[in-house]
């Protein structure tokens, strides 16, 4: 059953994204550089953790798009491709996966390499 669910999730992540287009990748940065990136008001900050993790504390201004949620791919496909995205999770694994998907969808992405665990700035609850 889990295999089927993971297969469906993988298929859904491909919807709306053109994987045949060469992408430039994404920047994986430390907390200091990430703080500089998100100072730009045009940057959309995305927290890829679960809603429960998000509610425990998140970077101010972040929106929650759970990478393990059913609607992750659909929500990413709806994002404004003209806005740069800054993405993070708890420790870096989920945000790297999300960043790869977002880049395949045509988004410009900066990823917080070691997640919110490395964040020294303000956290909002």
Question: What does each of the following model-derived ranges do?
Answer:
Residues 2-6, 15-37, 43, 52-84, ...:
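Rhodanese-like catalytic fold shared by cysteine-dependent sulfurtransferases
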């Amino acid at each position: 059953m889990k295999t089927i669910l993971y297969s469906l999730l993988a298929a859904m992540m491909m919807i709306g994204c053109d994987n045949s287009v060469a992408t430039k990748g994404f920047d994986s940065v430390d907390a200091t550089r990430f703080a500089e990136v998100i100072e730009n008001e045009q940057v959309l900050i995305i927290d890829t953790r679960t809603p429960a993790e998000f509610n425990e504390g998140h970077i101010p201004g972040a929106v929650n798009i759970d990478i393990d949620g059913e609607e992750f791919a659909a929500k990413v496909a709806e994002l404004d491709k003209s806005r740069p995205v800054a993405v993070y999770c708890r420790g870096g694994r989920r945000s790297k996966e999300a960043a790869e998907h977002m880049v395949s969808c045509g988004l410009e992405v900066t990823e917080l390499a070691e997640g919110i665990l490395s964040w020294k700035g303000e956290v909002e609850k």
